[in-house]
Amino acid sequence: MYKRQGWVYDPEGIDVAALKEIKEVKRARLTEYKNYRPNSEYHEGRGVWNVKVDIALPCATQNELHLEDAKALVANGCIAVCEGANMPTTLEATEYLQENGVIFAPGKAANAGGVATSALEMSQNSERLSWTFEEVDAKLKNIMVNICHNMVDAAERYGFKGNYVVGANIAGFEKVVDAMTAQGIV
């Protein structure tokens, strides 16, 4: 768990309930996490990408994961990086991760849930419907699965199997072309 001031490493996994208590109820600093989980460690600064992990989830700001960070992730055996923000990984870091066999899910696909949920909300409102949380969640899961399938399929069809950046770009472009064609623009 990473914030601008520092980060927490919990070998037993992040305790989401404790984190919510600290940040949402107490409005305290991340340093308080240690009081809830004695085996956890708090570190000042940016070193979060130096921890041995299987999966890294850069979800904060643009360009937060740099080439040096990507090298540390690869050296520590990271197998996948999934962006949860708008371009949190620099181009150099993305290329390095891909060149070293790390599965890389770009934010334009992996982070599409927020935009998709907004579209669902607009649809619901325009039709004067009231969906339950479960209904919205099911619709969102379906959208995200379709995005993933389209990304993987596009990468494979164009000879870039496993390159999800290319797959997401092509799949997105195809959607725009289909919409423009349907509107008679092309």
Regions found by a protein language model. Give the residues of each.
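Rossmann-fold NAD(P) dinucleotide-binding segment
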Residues: H43-V53, N63-A80
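Glycine-rich phosphate/diphosphate-binding loop of Rossmann-like nucleotide-binding domains
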Residues: M1-K52
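Short, well-ordered coil/turn residues at beta-beta hairpins
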Residues: L57-C59, G84
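Adenosine-phosphate binding glycine-rich loop
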Residues: A72-V186
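Flexible, active-site-adjacent loop/turn segments at secondary-structure boundaries
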Residues: Q5-W7, E12-K20, T31, N63, ...
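Beta-loop-alpha module in the N-terminal Rossmann-like domain of NAD(P)-dependent dehydrogenases
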Residues: A60-E68, P88-L91
